[in-house]
């Protein structure tokens, strides 16, 4: 498999995950991220939705408030040590409130990008780089 084929496959898998994330968002799910730049990256990738910053509150109170909304919860923290700890704690707290948060999108993004990037805010730049290397323009893929 050539480098371009590898990049194309990686881009395809990321685009599928972004489409899945977009679908969750359209259904009213709350997407939990760590910072404002994460939100900006997601919006630049075509994901509009209800974003919440997990790092601005007591995690217990934050989880309780989100759980009371009664909607699906997607944890999209960074895939560094801090993001892993935050995802684990949030998942535990949400579990205490009877909510099973979606973690698979985060985990799959982590696997696909593990040696390249470690955070959500870099995702837009990474996808742009993959699109450039594979010759896929944003116009061709902006159906998210």
Swiss-Prot record:
Gene3D superfamilies assigned: 3.40.1360.10
Keywords assigned by UniProt, alphabetized: Magnesium, Metal-binding
TM ranges: none
Matches recorded under InterPro entries: TOPRIM_dom, TOPRIM_RNase_M5-like, UPF0292
Disulphide bonds in the chain: none
GO molecular function per UniProt: metal ion binding
Classification via Pfam families: Toprim
Cofactor(s) the protein needs: Mg(2+)
Toprim domain ranges (all copies): 28-109
Residues that bind Mg(2+) 2: 78, 80
Family as reported in the entry's similarity comment: Belongs to the UPF0292 family.
Protein name: UPF0292 protein MA_4098
Source organism of this protein record: Methanosarcina acetivorans (strain ATCC 35395 / DSM 2834 / JCM 12185 / C2A)
């Amino acid at each position: 498999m050539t480098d371009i084929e590898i990049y194309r496959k990686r881009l395809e898998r990321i685009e599928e995950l972004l489409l899945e994330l977009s679908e969750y968002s359209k259904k009213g799910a709350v997407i939990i991220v760590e910072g404002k730049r994460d939100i900006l990256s997601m919006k630049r990738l075509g994901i509009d939705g209800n974003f919440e910053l997990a790092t601005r509150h007591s995690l217990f109170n934050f989880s309780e408030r989100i759980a009371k909304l009664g909607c699906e919860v997607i944890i999209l923290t960074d895939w560094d040590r801090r993001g892993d700890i935050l995802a684990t704690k949030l998942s535990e707290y949400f579990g205490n409130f009877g909510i099973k948060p979606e973690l698979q999108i985060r985990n799959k993004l982590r696997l696909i990008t593990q040696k390249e990037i470690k955070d959500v805010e870099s995702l837009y730049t990474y996808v742009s780089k993959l699109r450039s290397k594979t010759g896929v323009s944003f116009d061709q893929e902006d159906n998210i």
